[in-house]
Amino acid sequence: RFQSGIKNTSSSFALLALCWLLDNWISGERGSALEKPIKILITLPCLFYLAQRPPQSRWLWHGAVVGAMGALAIAIFQASNHMDLVRIGGLRANGFTNAIQFGNIALLLATISLCGWNAAHSRENLWRLWLIIGFASGILASLLSGSRGGWLSLVIMAGLTCLYLILTRRWRPFILLTSICSLTVIGAAQVPQLHLQERIALAQHEVQAYQQRGEANTSIGARLQMWEFAWQLYKEKPLLGWTQSGYMEQKREALEENRVDPFLNEFNHPHNELLDTASKRGSVGLMILFAIYFIPFRAFWSRFIEAKHPEAKAAYLSGLVIPIAYFGFG
């Protein structure tokens, strides 16, 4: 059944890549526009190879912990070079890529690290300390990135995990998980350099400003207007969408007619993967995107339920959090 899941996942990946390639061809885009579909196509032989020659699951968590620690090291390095910006909350560690993507990947590595908690190990206390270091490193790196949207995925994953623990009556892990999450949030809120309380207050203010006065020249206001704009485009062409070039042309017309704020001129993505796909590739693209989320989730979920060995169960749980996380990242 898991081999079937690999094949179905690979098929959905290939369809998504072809969908992007077709969009790029229709839009007349070349060069860097091919980066995303090519990356997806490159993963296909990797998936088949790993299905035939899977590594020891322990290296999955070692890699996640080291990756999370590396992300934190980069975030601290970038912060230490700009302490003046850190003090006023103006710095977002980006890992030399993009602050949002960097923060989301760090968050995912933190979650995968914690998934290995129940994996059997001869030195249990040392093993769990190692995983906690990875979890804390990923969380702190995400906080230093200033990315807020990705934390929705953490809420979803924590909620699903708590639900599973309640249904299986595993109260000790449930109490431990809720305690770790609560202490992490409370601890992060007390660190002034992270400016969490200020960010929450600012987000509330920007939402109210958009709802009451239509202000879209802020981070939250721009997102809300982009979402409305993308949803409107989807309703106009629900089957196949507008393509990337069509989306940009419609946005240009909306800017000229003052239907959207000029602040939106610099964005070519509505900051929501579902709405981006819906507006540019329609319902067909949406079905392919949902397949990307659902097929791997189903494959890992079925094996997770059936698995008896703690290490196998932990490995499948690590696989489960990946589609959940990317759905939450949006």
Feature locations, PLM:
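Membrane-embedded alpha-helical segments of multi-pass membrane proteins
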Residues: 1, 34-46, 101-110, 152-159, ...
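Alpha-helical transmembrane segments of multi-pass inner-membrane proteins
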Residues: 56-87, 97-167, 186-191, 298-301, ...
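Membrane-interface helix caps and helix-loop-helix hairpins in membrane proteins
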Residues: 25-33, 141-148, 330
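Transmembrane signal-anchor hairpin modules in multi-pass inner-membrane enzymes, especially those
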Residues: 1-28, 42, 52-58, 62, ...
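Long extracytoplasmic/lumenal interhelical loops at the membrane interface
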Residues: 85, 214-228, 236, 240-281, ...
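Transmembrane alpha-helix segments characteristic
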Residues: 5-20, 65, 69, 130-140, ...
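Hydrophobic transmembrane alpha-helices and their immediate junctions
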Residues: 163, 281-324
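A membrane-periplasm/extracellular boundary helix in multi-pass inner-membrane enzymes
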Residues: 144, 165-214, 228-236, 244
